[in-house]
């Protein structure tokens, strides 16, 4: 497959938010992880690591391109115009893995072929997760209406855009106890 495939890894990172998070975490985390969600290492203060220096969420800037990071990303993206774009994220610690298909309703400009492809890929993902006994959800949230996400922008440009979300987020730290008494570790993520 790779002989006829071009794979591009989008290196766009929120450097300001990452630095904010890393500096905060290194200041407050102990030598051994504290699994309690009440521990300070799981309670990052405002504005957290999500927004950039101007407190803008880069995950919502694809269409508007108001931030320099997005402009750099789109210059490359629009030059390549990929056929498939996977947008990887972390979500709250108590949510299992998420993958397409997106929640209804789909935006009216999304073609039947794009919908069918996304649904078919989601079924294959679900089959693999079921075989391994891994928790997941799809079709329940994360719609394809707002045009400026990392799955909708590619979809509106004719590609197959998909979001993948795994448990983690800034609250996870190195390890944390989830609501179902499971231990979520950085290694698991």
Task: Please place each PLM-identified region on the residue numbering.
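Long, well-ordered alpha-helical scaffolding segments within enzyme catalytic domains
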Residues: 118-124, 189
């Amino acid at each position: 497959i790779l002989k006829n495939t071009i794979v591009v890894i989008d290196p766009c990172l929120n450097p300001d938010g990452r630095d904010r998070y890393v500096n905060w975490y290194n200041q407050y985390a102990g030598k051994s992880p504290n699994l309690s969600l009440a521990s300070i290492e799981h309670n990052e203060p405002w504005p957290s690591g999500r927004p950039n220096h101007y407190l803008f969420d880069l995950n919502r800037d694809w269409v508007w391109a108001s931030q320099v990071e997005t402009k750099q990303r789109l210059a490359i993206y629009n030059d390549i115009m990929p056929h498939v774009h996977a947008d990887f994220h972390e979500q709250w610690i108590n949510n299992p893995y998420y993958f397409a298909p997106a929640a209804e309703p789909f935006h009216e400009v999304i073609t039947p072929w794009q919908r069918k492809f996304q649904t078919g890929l989601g079924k294959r993902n679900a089959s693999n997760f079921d075989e391994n006994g891994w928790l997941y959800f799809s079709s329940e949230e994360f719609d394809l209406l707002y045009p400026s996400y990392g799955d909708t922008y590619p979809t509106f440009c004719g590609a197959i855009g998909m979001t993948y979300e795994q448990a983690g987020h800034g609250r996870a730290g190195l390890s944390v106890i989830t609501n179902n008494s499971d231990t979520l570790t950085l290694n698991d993520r």
